[in-house]
């Protein structure tokens, strides 16, 4: 007998619906496209780098709203594992396949909280020779910021939504590899992460 879970019942409340997300992603894509067309680096297509795994849904939706030529790649920097709180010691665990020397790179993140993971990625990309690095984060949990966001060259920060200091899942974001397939962003009920040793991020 197959037992199925109703993941929707694990959600305390919905923060952003699928329609609200779709509208905001379209706005972000338009803003990035406009900036790229007026950039000094416009002769070479920008490289959009999705941060695996949480950003994959946002990344796919974003690039499909961008009409101009772009290149895409993925990177992974791990700091969460199966807990709800960042370990504070991220490391690059999936390297880029594309050459990024003298190219403008846009990092596409699901959520920025402490800033440690993002700082690790940006520093890594600069060491690889990127001429400038921008960041497009679906959610920004600025209340938890520990490391300031430092971009270089023509780098710019694009933010989808300001996120309250609660643990969110859905739209590619998970807890213990669940909830990525929810079409919205919601707050996870405490009883579904209460067995973890960490408090929610």
Per-range role (PLM):
Residues 1-201:
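PRPP-associated nucleotide enzymes
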